[in-house]
């Protein structure tokens, strides 16, 4: 199949290209951006020289629909909702890696502070949490989940949907590598401010909060909200979500373990660890590693979920959704050993 990537010069666009080039069934037909149009991508990013040398093209939806079978949007928020309209009108498959189609329009406006897509268009998009939402060939439009949301939702879904924890007790402390802040320079991601430092940002205001709540409420209506903090740590890649919660009355810790293993037993990209996971065990992969510890003294269940924010938190999950949409094996192009060192 042939694909096009819009937003090729960002971290996510480049990672999407890297994964697509190694996919057994994919040819990258065109790449698009607002800058460097007409320039070979390998002249901007020399690591691609001799591997992929296509020119960056101006965005043209008609050209993409003529030459490709699917378009990926790896664009900043506020872009895809406008550029995708013609694709939706023509029922042409779209995977949007931005937040533009994840939330209802009123919630999007509140948290993103940008004009939303219409209700009709938003409802045509399926939220692409691959292991949970049963993505298939019936889905034409995918709203790929956010990175923090992916790590948090996959950690909580089994025990929230089975009503094993108190939903009024959830605290999430999430930490991300610097690529999670995007390429645009700002004070929170400036090298001098982040190196040898720990920076908390968007406390109680991160745009993935309503996404997480919306998704988890679908499986447990009792959930009203969560306490969620986000911080940057001085690594390039990765997310660690540490979650604190309490068990429902009568629930035993062995039920937690058996539920995780049962829910995810046929999910190739989720690994339930005997102990707590480490970030370097998932970097460079599409895996989500989940571990937990129960403190009998305090009655607190601590869950740790780790992912590579650029792969499972973005480009890898997008490829996984593509595989499911086009009836490929779910793991095609995604069997990647961790970088580890």
Curated annotation (Swiss-Prot):
Q: Where is the active site?
A: 147
Which reaction is recorded as catalysed by this protein? N-acetyl-L-glutamate 5-semialdehyde + phosphate + NADP(+) = N-acetyl-L-glutamyl 5-phosphate + NADPH + H(+)
Q: Does the keyword Acyltransferase apply?
A: no
Q: Which GO terms describe its molecular function?
A: N-acetyl-gamma-glutamyl-phosphate reductase activity; NAD binding; NADP+ binding
* GO process terms (BP): L-arginine biosynthetic process
Q: Does the keyword Lipid metabolism apply?
A: no
Keyword terms of this UniProt record: Amino-acid biosynthesis, Arginine biosynthesis, Cytoplasm, NADP, Oxidoreductase
Which Pfam families does this UniProt record tie to the protein? Semialdhyde_dh, Semialdhyde_dhC_1
GO CC, sorted alphabetically, is: cytoplasm
- Its pathway? Amino-acid biosynthesis; L-arginine biosynthesis; N(2)-acetyl-L-ornithine from L-glutamate: step 3/4
List the CDD domains hit by this protein, alphabetically.
Answer: AGPR_1_C (cd23934), AGPR_1_N (cd17895)
NCBIfam families the record matches: argC
Which PANTHER family did the record assign?
N-ACETYL-GAMMA-GLUTAMYL-PHOSPHATE REDUCTASE, CHLOROPLASTIC-RELATED, N-ACETYL-GAMMA-GLUTAMYL-PHOSPHATE REDUCTASE, CHLOROPLASTIC-RELATED-RELATED
Primary role: Catalyzes the NADPH-dependent reduction of N-acetyl-5-glutamyl phosphate to yield N-acetyl-L-glutamate 5-semialdehyde.
Q: Which family does it belong to?
A: Belongs to the NAGSA dehydrogenase family. Type 1 subfamily.
Protein name, as recorded: N-acetyl-gamma-glutamyl-phosphate reductase
Organism, per UniProt?
Staphylococcus epidermidis (strain ATCC 35984 / DSM 28319 / BCRC 17069 / CCUG 31568 / BM 3577 / RP62A)
